[in-house]
Structures are given as C-alpha cells and as structure tokens.
Amino acid sequence: MDFNKPKILKNAVEYLAETFIQNGLDHCFILKDKHSVAPVELISSDDKVKLTVNSNYPSVQVYTSNFFNKEPSLVPNVTYSNYAAICIEPGYYPNAINTPLFTEKNPTLKLGEDFNKFIQFKFETY
C-alpha cells in the first residue's frame, strides 16, 4: 500500500478489511531517508482539521481501531465501532532486534550513549 500521494483513508481501510485478515489498517511504513523529517498528514473529510506528524525515526506504524468493542465507552451514550480511531506511532522497525537486515536502522543503545529522537504532533483547524 502506497501512501506517498494523498488517499482517502476510508477507502484504503475498507479495501484492507475486505482483503486481509487484520480487518483494517495495521502497517509499518518505512520512510525513505533516515535523516529527513517525513511528515504524516491526516486531513478531515471537510478540510477543517489537519494533523501533521513529524519525526526523525526511520518508520511509522499506523493502525486503525480494527477490533473496537462497543462497550464500555469513555463518553456516556456513545459507542465506538471499528475504525473510529487511528494511531500513528513513529519509531524503529518492528522486531528489528531479531532481523539482521534492520539492525543498522534500529541501533541498540548502550550505557552512556545519548539518545536523540523527536516526534511532533501538530493540529490545525480552518
């Protein structure tokens, strides 16, 4: 699945739900350049809200609420169904410590070494 160009997320999630076992979106997207800040953008269907996620991690895990239970709800008289939420988690590649191909992209931090990564979430309304 290629999200290099804007896509309607609902269509992608419905396609995945019909095609694959995970019943929605649950993917790790590898970013092209480990030194760049590659933004992830979500824009509401009415173009009134935009979320931009910037990070210098090498990948981003994106998943929808594929298996939401309808109970309990955090808000009285509101039930949530599948795909009512989305999560965007910049980070290292999943299971990289056990995958030699990914070792360079997922360094092991040793005692005394510095760790310097950032994640920025920016919300805009129009």
Question: PLM features: residue spans?
Answer:
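Active-site pocket scaffolds in enzymes
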Residues: 2-126
